[in-house]
Amino acid sequence: MDYLASTTQTQPKTVIDAGCGWGLSGIWCAKHLQATVASLDADPDVIPYLELTAKINGAEVTPIVGRFEDLGSDLLSATDLLIGADICFWDELVDPVIAMITTAIESGTKRIVIADPQRAPFLAVCEHILEHFGGE
């Protein structure tokens, strides 16, 4: 959130919080960037916590139960900012996260920010994306 606050020059109008969990990053974007936020998670059991956390914080997000691979070019092409925090913690998530980021880039998503504590699966994603698309 500090990174987004310090590096966001233009306010994104639309944000997807991929692998949102309880949704803190997306809720922050809704509240502080006044963005329309879709919060996606594969686990339907997190949605009540997401909704409660949003309510407590006075923010509105749209919960979506789905997987990374469910984010198609139709949705990503209309997205200003794709965020994900701690979403690549298992080896099985490498390919779906790479596919999501690739689809976002090819669809014209304006900005992608993925945060991670530098686990090995995430580093594999980084290597692939840097090799094929560049980035920081």
Identify the meaning behind each predicted range.
Residues 1-136:
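S-adenosylmethionine-dependent methyltransferases
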